Amino acid sequence: PRDPDMFHVSTLVNEAARLAGRDKDYYPDSGVNNIMSFGRIAEYIMRVPVWEECDKTNSTFDMQVILKDTKENIVGTLDGIIRAKDEPFPRAIVEIKSKYSKVGSPLDNWRYMAQVMAYLKLAHTTVCWMPILYFPRGEPDVQARLFKIRFDVSEIDANWNLLLNARDALIDESINERE
């Protein structure tokens, strides 16, 4: 369950998108029914390549991790983190996605990258493993890919500042509504 006293990363990404005029790209096609069920199934399926990659790299996959920045009052619910078996600190975060399109680069999806960089900030790391299950509308069949994406700290910090501005806009909006 979400902490009602904290701002969730996804809320801040949605607000940043709205402020930037990107809110129209959020909603799925009307032809996709019960999209959350497909997403949950894809998330379960796409854990397998993460586990396989962890076996190859002597790493562990901690699933369903909640990270908080209590100073900034922000919480993130990650699909997981990757750690070396003998280290307590994350090497990478895991963010599992499903897309109803042909295979493409996740770097082209602004929302994905904004969410991932926020999670990286919370986890104090710079690498994301992003398994994506693609459901194309035509040929070919379903495709699964595991992307490993590294960001510069400066990119992560710039994204974090964008989300802090979105948080502040939500706070200002709430104050104005009460007046």
Predicted regions and their residues:
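Short coil/turn motifs at secondary-structure junctions
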Residues: K85, K99-S101, F135-R137
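A structural signal for short, well-ordered beta-strand segments and their strand-loop junctions
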Residues: T60, I93-E95, V127-I132
